Amino acid sequence: MEWNGLKMIISTMEPQVSNGPTSNTSNGPSSNNRNCPSPMQTGAATDDSKTNLIVNYLPQNMTQEEFRSLFGSIGEIESCKLVRDKITGQSLGYGFVNYIDPKDAEKAINTLNGLRLQTKTIKVSYARPSSASIRDANLYVSGLPKTMTQKELEQLFSQYGRIITSRILVDQVTGVSRGVGFIRFDKRIEAEEAIKGLNGQKPSGATEPITVKFANNPSQKSSQALLSQLYQSPNRRYPGPLHHQAQRFRLDNLLNMAYGVKRLMSGPVPPSACPPRFSPITIDGMTSLVGMNIPGHTGTGWCIFVYNLSPDSDESVLWQLFGPFGAVNNVKVIRDFNTNKCKGFGFVTMTNYDEAAMAIASLNGYRLGDRVLQVSFKTNKAHKS
């Protein structure tokens, strides 16, 4: 798929670091990589920027096609771009969308801002042109207590100005903090004040003074190379399980806000709504499922059949229904060839079995508008499209 360039000139903006699974929180373009352009900063829309959006905290494995599909479901897009590291090709966790109609841009913010995708909660907002006052406002912080949370990190730095994004790096296997974080302020002068106030200080719980400096310091090139190797490692993995209760709370809020969805059943979900639990990768840690005839299992993940969609349903409905539960590879609404209306069903492919099963257990029986959804793993029975 060819992608149109954005009207926004991003080549003149300051470089950032890629956002990968080494973070314990969703990343924005708040880090320090010299191989990519910096995003435009978020802020109030002007007359010239009411169609231009910046999207932060995207999942590391989200593709450009999925990015376009998600935002294209809202309205006609003039251009969009998922920003990648120029050397490694890895997604940096943010992108830009430029709509033709300002109303669609506003709708995208109202509908998709705060949407949970995999382990991240995306942030959708208007973009504003970069300027000297907001360039180079990224800070690198080391020596943090291993017990410090992202919220505590923000509380520590928030006294110096408005924080755009923050993150703490964690060990990919254990999920334990590496004691290193990043803070992006709204303005460079705020970052300068934070350096003056906190560099060499000992925050609560710290045994050693912390180091606070600008993230784009050339001396960090070796760290950038190490991060790039980590991102490209085939053995990397996301730490820890997803917190499904938090996701479920987010789903209820999102569906009620966007579609007026109400849970049809007040009691527990019937056992038939959720297939027996087993590992999608191995059985007893030894036997691969490749080649086994298991409902819903495909070469790219777990395919879910969604039935009783309304004729006006599109891909955005499926994205918003299933995104809160985990990694969604792709979605597809089956349409009538003549009318281009939804034929009443669609498919969602999710990477992880547990996440797919949780989505089925939660969404089977949901009332979407005046229809009750039937959600299950796809069987081998062919569905005519």
From Swiss-Prot:
Inducing stimuli: Up-regulated by glucose and by insulin. Up-regulated after memory training in radial arm maze experiments. Up-regulated after sciatic nerve injury. Up-regulated during adult neuronal stem cell differentiation.
Ranges where the RRM domain occurs: 51-129, 137-217, 302-380
Protein name: ELAV-like protein 4
GO cellular component: axon; cytoplasm; dendrite; growth cone; perikaryon; ribonucleoprotein complex
Gene disruption: observed consequences: Transiently impaired neurite extensions of several cranial nerves, including glossopharyngeal nerve, hypoglossal nerve, trigeminal nerve and acousticofacial nerves in the midembryonic nervous system at 10.5 dpc, however no developmental delays of the nervous system in later-stage embryos at 14 dpc are obvious. By postnatal weeks 4 to 8, 70-80% of the mice exhibit an abnormal clasping reflex of the hind limbs upon being suspended by the tail. Decreased motor coordination, as impaired performance on an accelerating rotarod is observed.
Modified residues (Phosphoserine): S38, S233
Domain notes: The RRM 3 domain is required for binding to poly(A) RNA, for the association with polysomes and with the EIF4F cap-binding complex and for the stimulation of translation. The RRM 1 and RRM 2 domains may contribute to polysome association and stimulation of translation.
Disordered: annotated segments: 12-48
Matches recorded under CDD domains: RRM2_Hu, RRM3_HuD
Domain of life: Eukaryota
Source species of the chain: Mus musculus (Mouse)
GO annotation (BP), single: learning
Biased composition (Polar residues): 34-44
Biased composition (Low complexity): 18-33
Organs and tissues of expression: Expressed in the brain, including the hippocampus, and in pancreatic beta cells (at protein level). Expressed in pyramidal neurons of the hippocampal CA3 and CA1 region and in the hilus but not in dentate granule cells (at protein level). Expressed in the dorsal root ganglion and the spinal cord (at protein level). Expressed in neural stem and progenitor cells (at protein level).
NCBIfam families: ELAV_HUD_SF
Name of the gene encoding the protein in the UniProt record: Elavl4
Entry keywords, A to Z: Cell projection, Cytoplasm, Methylation, mRNA processing, mRNA splicing, Phosphoprotein, Repeat, RNA-binding
Localisation: Cytoplasm; Perikaryon; Cell projection, Dendrite; Cell projection, Axon
